[in-house]
Amino acid sequence: MSQTNSHAQAGGTAKPIGLLIAAVGVVYGDIGTSPLYTLKEVFQGGYGVEVTHDAILGVLSLIFWSLIWVVSFKYMAFVLRADNQGEGGIMALMALARRASAKHPKLQMMMVVFGLFGAALFYGDSMITPAVSVLSAMEGLELAFDGLDHWIVPMALVVLVGLFLIQRHGTARIGVLFGPVMVVWFLVLGALGVYGIMQSPEVLKAVNPAWGLNFFIIHPGIGVAILGAVVLALTGAEALYADMGHFGRKPISRAWFILVLPALLLNYFGQGALVLGNPETVRNPFYLLAPSWALLPLIGLSTMATIIASQAVISGAFSMTLQAIQLGYIPRMHIQHTSSDAQGQIYIGAVNWALMVGVIMLVIGFESSGALASAYGVAVTGTMLCTTILVSTVMLMLWKWPPLLAVPLLICLLLVDGLFFAANVPKIFQGGAFPVLAGAVLFILMTTWKRGKHLLAERIDEGGLPLPIFIGSIRVQPPHRVQGTAVFLTARSDAVPHALLHNMLHNQVLHEQVVLLTVVYEDTPRVPSAQRFEVESYGEGFYRVILHFGFIDEPDVPAALALCHLAELDFSPMRTTYFLSRETVIPSKMDGMARWREALFAFMLKNANGNLRFFKLPFNRVIELGTQVEM
C-alpha cells in the first residue's frame, strides 16, 4: 500500500481508467495469484478427493459461488460501504464499530477484541502471503527444468529477502509498473482459461450450484473440510476493503466486475477443463494449462505478480501498524517516510524485519506452497469472520438498518464465514498453528500495551497535584518568570504534569507562557485543521491546549501549535521549549496486571520510540525528565 498513496491524493483528478489500473495493481495482487495453487491444493492437499468428473465440477461450483457470495456480494455490496470517512481496513472498521457501540461498554469491548484479533491474524497473513505466493510461482520451474526441485526454496528466499531489503528505499518508482503488470496478468489468466475451456466446454455446467450441493452429498465426510481449500480462492479479499481509502469504492468495484472476476473464473474453469480431460495434470494445473512454449514467460510473469502481491501485504502491514500506533494499541516505532511527494508512503523497520524473519522461517519450514496452504486458510477465514462481526454491529447500531431486514442477512453472512472458519480449524494441527500462535502473541502484545498505558496513567495520576491549587499557590508566591513558552506534554487536563513539578523543584523558575499540551487521537482517519486544537486559559500565563489527530494523520505537534496563533498564543520556534516525561515502570504486586504482563509492558515501554521523534519535536528545544512508576 505504500505505493498507493500517490494515487489517493490524485484520486480526485485521475482519469477513471488510470485509477482502475492502479487499483488492479495494488488491491487484487493477492486474490489474483490464488489460481497458482487453489485447485492443486483441493486435489493434492490430502483431503481424499478423487479426480472424477463430478468432483471436478463440484469443486469448480464451490469456487464459483464462493467468489460470487463472499467477494461480489458481501464485500462489494456491504463491507465496502462501511467506510470510516473513506478509509477501510479492520482497524478503521474497529474504530467505527467502537463508536457505534459507545453506549454499550461490554459490546464495545467485544468489538475491540474482534478488531484486534482480526488485525493480529492479518500480520500472520502478511507473512504467509509472500511465502506461499513466491513459492508457488517458483514451483513452475520444476516443470520447465529437470533436477531443479532442490533449488526452489533457495531461489524463493533470494527473491523474498531482496523484496524486504528494498523496502526502506520505498517503491514509488517501480510502483507505477504494478498496475500494468497486473492487468497483463489478469488478461493472461483469462486467455489461458478460454484456451482450456475450449478443450472441454462441458466444464461450464459447474455454474449450476447443484454441482456444489452434489459434491457435499457424494463426499459427506469431507464436504465441509474441502471448504478449507476452496477458501484459498478468496485470499486477498480483505485487501479490497483495506485499500478503499487509496482508491475509493467505485474503482475497486469496477475493476472486480470488469476484469478481475471474469479472469479468475475463466482461469479456474480452464484448469478444471484441463484436469477433466487429463487427470494427471492435477499436479500443477495452472502451469500445465499453458502451451509448452509459453511456460518460461508465464513463470516470469507469475513471479512478478507474486512479488506485487507480496508488496501489497507488506505495505498493508506498515499502514495498519501506523493506525494501531495512533489508536494506542502498539508502542510507538520509528516511522520513515520514503517519498517526499506522497505523505502515506512509509517504512517501519521493526515490522519489516519481523515479517522477513517470519517469511524465511515459513519458507524453510514448509518448503512448498502446498504445505503452506494449510496455514493460509486459518488467517484468511479468521480475519473475514472478524470483519463480518464488526460490520454487523455497524449495520445495526450505526446505520440503524431494520432488524427484520438486517438480521436474516447477517445470519447468512456469518453462517458462510463460520463454515469456512470451521473447515480450517482442523488445520491448526496440520501446520495452521502458525498464524494462530502469531495472532495470539500479537493480540497479547496489543492488549498488554493498551492496558499497561491505562494503568500507567492511573498510577501517575494518583496523588497528583490539582492544577487550580498549583496556580493558586503561584498567585500567593510568584516564582521567577523567564521569557518564552514552555510546553509540557500530559495526558490529564486537571493535574500538574510531573515534568512541570520537577522543573519547578530543580530550577525554581517558570516561563512567562506555560502550555499544558494533550494529544488526542480520534476514531476517525483525519481531523480537519479547523478542528485541530482547543485552547483554554487558566490565568497566570497558564493555558490548556488539546490537539486532535485522526488515526492516519501525521502528528506534527509544532505545525499544529503554529495554528494556535489564532488564539493569540506565541509558539515561535526559538522561544518555545518542550518538556517531556520519560517513565520507567517497576513491576510490583499491586493490582492491575499479572506480573509477567507488567514485565512485558515495562520492556515494551523501555523500547518504544519516544515522543520527541514521534511528534516531530525539534531536538535542540526538548528537555526530557525521567520518573519511576510502580505498577
From Swiss-Prot:
Where's it mainly located?
Answer: membrane
Query: Could you tell me the membrane topology recorded for this protein?
Result: Multi-pass membrane protein
Catalysed reaction(s) here are: K(+)(in) + H(+)(in) = K(+)(out) + H(+)(out)
Where do transmembrane segments lie in this chain?
17-37, 56-76, 109-129, 147-167, 174-194, 215-235, 256-276, 288-308, 346-366, 378-398, 403-423, 428-448
Q: Which UniProt keywords apply?
A: Cell inner membrane, Cell membrane, Ion transport, Membrane, Potassium, Potassium transport, Symport, Transmembrane, Transmembrane helix, Transport
Q: Where in the cell is it found?
A: Cell inner membrane
Q: Which GO CC annotations does the UniProt entry carry?
A: plasma membrane
Q: Does the keyword Cell membrane apply?
A: yes
The protein's matches in InterPro entries, at most eight in alphabetical order, are given as: K+_transporter (IPR003855), K_trans_C (IPR053952), K_trans_N (IPR053951), Kup (IPR023051)
Please indicate which superkingdom the organism of origin belongs to.
Answer: Bacteria
Membership in a protein family = Belongs to the HAK/KUP transporter (TC 2.A.72) family.
Sum up the protein's function in the record's words: Transport of potassium into the cell. Likely operates as a K(+):H(+) symporter.
Which PANTHER family does the entry mention?
Answer: LOW AFFINITY POTASSIUM TRANSPORT SYSTEM PROTEIN KUP, OSMOTIC STRESS POTASSIUM TRANSPORTER
Stated name of the protein: Probable potassium transport system protein Kup
List the lineage, top down: Bacteria, Pseudomonadati, Pseudomonadota, Gammaproteobacteria, Pseudomonadales
* Gene name in the database record: kup
